[in-house]
Amino acid sequence: MSHYTGPLLTRETAADLHRTFEGGADRWHGSLDLARSDDDVILSADGFRFRDHAYPWPGKLKDRTLYYWGGEEFAPISRFGSALIKLVPTEWGAPTFEIDGIKMLPTAKVSPFDDARRKVELVAPAGKSLLDTCGGLGYFAACCLEAGVGQIRSFEKNPDVLWLRTLNPWSPDPAAASAGGRLQLTQGDVSKEIETLPASSVDAILHDPPRFGIAGELYSQVFYDQLSRVIRKGGRLFHYTGAPNKLTSGRDVPREVIKRLEKAGFKAELALDGVLATKR
């Protein structure tokens, strides 16, 4: 799917555009692509002109919601399939997303993109072949491309998440010249797809699964054995776990992950908000 290049509006941005016009100006300068770039936007009574295309003024917009031009009106970037999935703006520019109201990426203290960059640095992707198990919005993949990865194979199970990616200017486009053909994005369940990958075929792995209660199979010994099979000796794996409350959950997920990874043939330790492991 090709990536969207039209305007992205929040309630605040739309209000700023309208306020500028009502103040007597016919031009607004700023970003309508979530702080990826700045543009001059021409304002009129009928609406605004962005990148040589005219758009009407939007109707009433909701808070914490991003809107895109759907051809006839500005529509929220959300879908309801098996769950309500929604792209959510942040103060950092790069958006997060929610599934049934549960935020999937950290945003309280750091940009989700910068958070991904810190984790990617742990596996030193430059020149390597890398497996990205749960692609999400593609921030791991984008940071790997930025860092000079040789090749990255990324899986994402949810088609609605893949749709969000086409509307998010922070998500990497596999077809873009900047990707240079290095990103292969596949819709599929990595717990099954990994069985098709050759042994010792990747140099590093980034594993960012949903929480244990949603995708327990991605924390299983069977899956960790597959990760061990496909990664070369000395290869690094970063496994996001978050910091689940041991008192309320009754379990120490990061320590359980370390134990299973070591059984699978890794040397593992706590790192950032997850586990860093090296194939022995």
Features from the language model and the residues they span:
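A short glycine-rich, Lys/Arg-flanked "PGG" loop and its adjoining helix->strand segment in the class I
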Residues: 219-233
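Conserved class I S-adenosyl-L-methionine
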Residues: 126-137
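Class I S-adenosyl-L-methionine
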Residues: 243-280
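N-terminal auxiliary segments of SAM/dcSAM-dependent transferases
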Residues: 1-90
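S-adenosyl-L-methionine
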Residues: 155-199
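Conserved SAM-binding loop of SAM-dependent methyltransferases across substrates and taxa
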Residues: 137-149
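Conserved alpha-helix/loop element of class I SAM-dependent methyltransferases that forms part
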Residues: 110-128
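Conserved beta-strand signature within the Rossmann-like core of class I S-adenosyl-L-methionine
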Residues: 234-242
